[in-house]
């Protein structure tokens, strides 16, 4: 097993070296990079599902599905099945989740309870992964699809290398491929403040949040592109992390416009994972999760510089909401 892993790593580095050489030639001729990105959306049916009525959840999902179809953007949604179980609303919530597969989008597992591998331990986490499969597998099978992808809650992949390797082996044994993240603009934090503003009818704050979110996302893409080039010499097929919330439901098309202005085409997660960067050695372990560009940089002993500073005023508003009774 270890020999095969070593051979794969050497092969990946050789092919990456070829990609770097080609990319260098493109840079010298002034050619634009072939930018592609896969969209992944976490915390289905909704990040704030417990505080959201079935009617609001259904409306949000309908808007997001319509925007994805209109923009012709493929996506994979990662499910926390615990959020389906609210007294008197289970059927409606499952129906809202089924809209994803009925619209032709794939679902992945995000654990049942959004458990962090770093916090609950391996056995409890494994049980939560299994518990999070039941409804999702049924919905996918009804549309001749398989449950193929797993996304780590909080991007926590293990506090130590042994735990990480055991968790990885467990996921492979259940037929999963881990969905990495290379671009993350913290839409979950924007989304929480946005939903609060929407409930209170504060249209001015909603608009301010949207503009800040779109601007910050643009900065994060620029940072990820540059870090990629510093790390491997070219811009790989990126994977963007989003969350199921009303911010995305209401403004996804505007986000798409920002991304397209940077020259991106939207691709499937499967196509993105075909980029050889996702075969690079990755021994990242820590108390806190992070994106995979950081994984690879730290694995190579080159911790990255800090990314764009997240707007402090959004953080302060999010804290104030959490303190509100």
What kind of region is each of these model predictions?
Residues 11-23:
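Bacterial N-terminal signal peptides
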Residues 101-109, 135-140, 203-222, 290-310, ...:
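Short, basic, helix/turn surface patches
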Residues 24-28:
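Signal peptide processing junction and immediate N-terminal pro/mature segment
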């Amino acid at each position: 097993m270890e020999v095969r892993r070593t051979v794969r790593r050497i092969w990946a580095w050789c092919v990456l070296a070829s990609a770097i050489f080609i990319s260098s030639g493109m840079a010298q001729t002034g050619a634009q990079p072939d930018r592609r990105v896969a969209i992944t959306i976490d915390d289905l049916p909704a990040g704030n599902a417990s505080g959201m009525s079935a009617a609001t959840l259904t409306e949000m999902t309908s808007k997001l599905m319509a925007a994805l179809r209109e923009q012709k953007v493929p996506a994979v949604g990662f499910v926390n099945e615990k959020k389906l179980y609210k007294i008197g609303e289970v059927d409606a919530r499952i129906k809202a989740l089924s809209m994803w597969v009925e619209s032709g989008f794939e679902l992945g597992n995000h654990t049942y309870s959004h458990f962090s591998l770093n916090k609950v331990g391996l056995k409890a986490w494994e049980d939560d992964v299994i518990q999070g499969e039941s409804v999702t597998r049924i919905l996918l099978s009804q549309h001749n699809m398989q449950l193929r992808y797993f996304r780590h809650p909080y991007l926590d992949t293990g506090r130590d290398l042994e735990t990480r390797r055991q968790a990885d082996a467990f996921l492979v044994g259940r037929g999963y491929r881990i969905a990495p993240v290379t671009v993350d603009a913290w839409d979950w934090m924007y989304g929480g403040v946005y939903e609060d503003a929407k409930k209170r009818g504060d249209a001015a704050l909603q608009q301010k949040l949207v503009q800040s979110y779109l601007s910050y996302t643009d900065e994060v893409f620029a940072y990820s592109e540059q870090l990629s080039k510093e790390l491997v010499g070219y811009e790989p097929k990126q994977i963007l992390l989003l969350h199921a919330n009303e911010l995305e439901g209401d403004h996804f098309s505007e986000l798409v416009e920002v991304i397209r202005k940077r020259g991106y085409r939207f691709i499937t997660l499967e196509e993105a994972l075909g980029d050889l960067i996702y075969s690079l050695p990755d021994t990242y372990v820590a108390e806190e999760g992070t994106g995979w560009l950081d994984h690879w940089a730290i694995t190579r002993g080159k911790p990255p510089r800090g990314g764009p500073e997240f707007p402090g005023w959004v953080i302060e508003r999010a804290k104030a909401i959490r303190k509100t009774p």
